[in-house]
């Protein structure tokens, strides 16, 4: 690949500040607490930190619910076929 074509390829792959801002705004709209203050200008770093925290909390919630479901399965009178389907979903 020539130097000129590499330069064109790398510039085409670059994302603009406007695109980053748009993506951060969309990400902020997905955060439950951020929706309340969607009109406020929040720094991108803060949105990313809140997103990471939210994802971690969702992981914890999934783990807790999976554990709870496993306990219910162990205690419930569930047919073998139903239990196999539910266990398969948990994996």
From Swiss-Prot:
Gene Ontology BP, a term: regulation of growth
Keyword Nucleotide-binding annotated: no
InterPro entries noted in UniProt: bHLH_dom, HLH_DNA-bd_sf, PRE
bHLH domain ranges (all copies): 4-58
Domain of life: Eukaryota
Record key words, sorted: Growth regulation, Transcription, Transcription regulation
SUPFAM superfamilies, per the entry: HLH, helix-loop-helix DNA-binding domain (SSF47459)
GO molecular function, one term: protein dimerization activity
Gene3D superfamilies: Helix-loop-helix DNA-binding domain
Function: Atypical and probable non DNA-binding bHLH transcription factor that integrates multiple signaling pathways to regulate cell elongation and plant development.
Listed PANTHER family: TRANSCRIPTION FACTOR ILI7 (PTHR46446:SF37), TRANSCRIPTION FACTOR PRE (PTHR46446)
Family according to the record: Belongs to the bHLH protein family.
Stated name of the protein: Transcription factor ILI7
Lineage: Eukaryota, Viridiplantae, Streptophyta, Embryophyta, Tracheophyta
Gene expressing this chain: ILI7
């Amino acid at each position: 690949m020539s130097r000129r074509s590499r330069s064109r390829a790398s510039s085409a792959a670059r994302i603009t500040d406007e695109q980053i801002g748009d993506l951060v705004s969309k990400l902020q709209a997905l955060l439950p607490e951020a929706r309340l203050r969607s009109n406020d200008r929040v720094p991108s770093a803060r949105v990313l930190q809140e997103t990471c925290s939210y994802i971690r909390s969702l992981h914890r919630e999934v783990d807790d619910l999976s554990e709870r479901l496993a306990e219910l399965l162990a205690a419930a009178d569930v047919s073998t076929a139903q239990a196999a389907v539910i266990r398969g979903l948990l994996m």
